[in-house]
Amino acid sequence: NMDMSVHMETMPAVGETVLGDGLGYQMGGKGANQACACGRLGGDVKILGCVGRDEFGSRQIESLGAAGGDALGLRQSPGLPTGTAVIYVDRNGDNSIVVIPGANRECGEQYLREQDELFRWCGIIVLQMEIPMEAVLYAARRGRELGKTVILNPAPAPDKLPDELLGLVDYLTPNETELAKLSGIAAVGQADLKRAARLLIGKGVKKVLVTLGEQGALLVDGETERLYPARQVESVDTTAAGDCFNGALATALAEGMAEDEAIRFANLAASLAVTRKGAQSSLPDREEVERLSGDNRERSA
């Protein structure tokens, strides 16, 4: 997607007009952000998806390449424009997002069937919900058939995910809002979060990893409930924090890191991303994360 970010003091209420502090354009889209996060962290990543045959589409391909991602599998649609997201960011760095899918609608099952070589090549499949459900389902099915680890970032969250899809997911990574929507349980504390996560595990998900912003991440599976605290930083813009977390998690798991270590690595990467404005422009590189990791070890020594 092409992201249009609007910065303001406070979000407007219904019927209210507020003055903005700035307007920016950056390359974005959840799948592209996740792929760029992997690439900048040293992962060997290839992205599948659809962009328009337009300036924004060409810029997206260039941005992915510059981040170390392989965009050769991307399809450029002659009939639909590159997707667009309008992102509202308040003074605390919190955001609300409206997505116009555009060419993302053409990322369907048939297109993915033509990319089977990449499904066989990879070790981790990272999915998100800005593409049609049929594509998400097919990718998860194919991943399970091939014995791949499937990570699903359920954003933007639908009212319900098919039980079949939940049963194909190794790591479901919602934020608190997405978890509440998918489970039907309004979370007002950790007990509610755990109950909501266990409801989804009861439908077949192996592990639910809830991203909690400045609080870190909560892992819930058949046996474990564990909170991974985040590094405390001054948040500027949370736009791509979840995408960064997912990309870093995938990179770490693909490298063979133990689960605990991989989640801590993802937390550190996301904590760096929120200190900068923008989506792909906010994503850290490997050296930055390792430097912060070293700082953390010194603090705990």
Functional labels for PLM-detected ranges:
Residues 123-195, 214-217:
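Conserved beta-alpha-beta core of the PfkB/ribokinase-like small-molecule kinase fold
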Residues 63-79:
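A glycine-rich helix N-cap at a beta->alpha junction
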Residues 50, 72-77, 87-124, 129:
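Conserved phosphate-binding/catalytic loop of the ribokinase/pfkB sugar-kinase fold
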Residues 1-50, 55-66, 234-236, 301:
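Glycine-rich phosphate/adenosyl-contacting loop at the front of the ribokinase-like
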Residues 39, 144, 254:
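Gly/Ala-rich phosphate-binding loop of Rossmann-like dinucleotide-binding domains
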Residues 159-164, 190-301:
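Conserved phosphate-binding/catalytic region of the ribokinase-like
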